[in-house]
């Protein structure tokens, strides 16, 4: 058995149709990088697990004991992975070009100090999907504090109608 360079882990919950398109896109735009596809089903309980397993016998299909969330599925998939690198995908991802996976793999090999990377994502109409950053905890606390102060001042203003000015 040759060395697997990349383990592609996909966590599924009742997304069989888009998952099939995802796997078919790997067959259409097959990477040169050696890879395995691992699908972790988060206990969909919709009766489609076995038929999907027969339809895509080339993938590792793992049934989780419950729906413990995306991260649990990723952890279970990575436990079963034998690739040098891990690629986590959502089931609604489809490849649109051949070099996409190979380029990411080459980047990871050439930059061993990089621990995580991503790629450009596009909507199905071809438009670029915007990257979304999470708010820092301090910014979140600041927003919540402002909302609380505003709500509190409105409550106080109602008690004292002559002081209608909130700000």
Regions found by a protein language model. Give the residues of each.
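Short, flexible, basic/aromatic active-site loop/helix in glycosyltransferases
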Residues: 137-167
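Short aromatic/hydrophobic "clamp" motif used to bind/position activated sugar donors
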Residues: 86
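Conserved donor NDP-sugar-binding/catalytic core segment of glycosyltransferases
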Residues: 96-131
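N-proximal low-complexity "stem/linker" segments adjacent to membrane-targeting elements
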Residues: 1-27
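Glycine-rich, basic loop-to-helix element that forms the pyrophosphate-binding segment
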Residues: 63-81
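Short beta-strand/loop segment that forms part of the nucleotide-sugar
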Residues: 34-43, 62-64
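A conserved acidic beta->alpha catalytic loop
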Residues: 25, 41-49, 66
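The conserved acidic donor/metal-binding loop of glycosyltransferases
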Residues: 90-94
